Amino acid sequence: PAMRAWSFYADDPENSKTAHDMGIIMGTSHHEPMARNHQEWARKRKQYGVWDYATNQKVLDRFFREGIERVKDTEDLITIGMRGDGDAPMGGKEGADHEYVNRDEYNMNLLKKVIKNQRKIIKDVTGRPADERPQVWAIYKEVQRFYDIGLRVPDDVIMLLCDDNWGNVRRLPNAEERKRPGGWGMYYHVDYVGAPRNSKWLNVTPIQNMWEQLQLTYDYGVDKLWILNVGDLKPMEYPITLFLDMAWNPKRYTADNLLEHPRGFCARQFGEEQADEATRILNLYSKYNGRVTPEMLDCHTYNIETPYDDINVYLK
């Protein structure tokens, strides 16, 4: 659900109940463990203290337990693990992941403890073995580095791989890794808020790139869970549609018939008479936006005064 200044679970107790009644399985983001939204902590930071398991374990364990108690009678997917305070690396700040490589071993050992205790909380609160409650561990940013150098979670947990925040998949499981009972998932972005630049409010993901990356994802057995970071809904209607249609039927579109998808979308929005031209525009729009996003654009981009004829080269 939406994040930033909002909290799905805390802002209105009817949110979770309504979702459950409608058969909708909810979850939280990669940095919001144990069914707790970040804003629930941020709003009471003076009361709770520092978001650091090494120094504030008692408070954090209670915070985690309250989250599981709240969703124990739902089918909600539980995020386990822990990152820093507010989508940052453990003990660090957003956009500076590389500065904390020398803390990897320390952070890995701390994360092992966090996950072990979280699993115990899940077992204690639900009264069932932890492996009977669906959980996901996001291998996002610096956490992928932990995985690559040896950090592992129990086999029943879904491993959520991620793109690079710009629509390019960072990692896929090999043949041996694909044998995990918990399976694999993908967290994909068409909207991004973070370093080095935001990308929001406009679709900057080329149609062909998104199709190719999601097709690759599926071909490598990453099919247990797909999550799309969409930001604002209205400008992302097309990539949301493509993502959901591919999740429903990953083999429906090929390199040869891919443009049938945006044409079908445009026909529904604008009618058959305008569909061909609208498809052409939509395709070029995402192509050009993907080359240079609005946040990256400046007076030197496609400069008509340079001797390299940038504008005509890129518009071909």
Label the predicted regions.
Residues M159, T217, N229, F265:
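Conserved, mostly hydrophobic/aromatic
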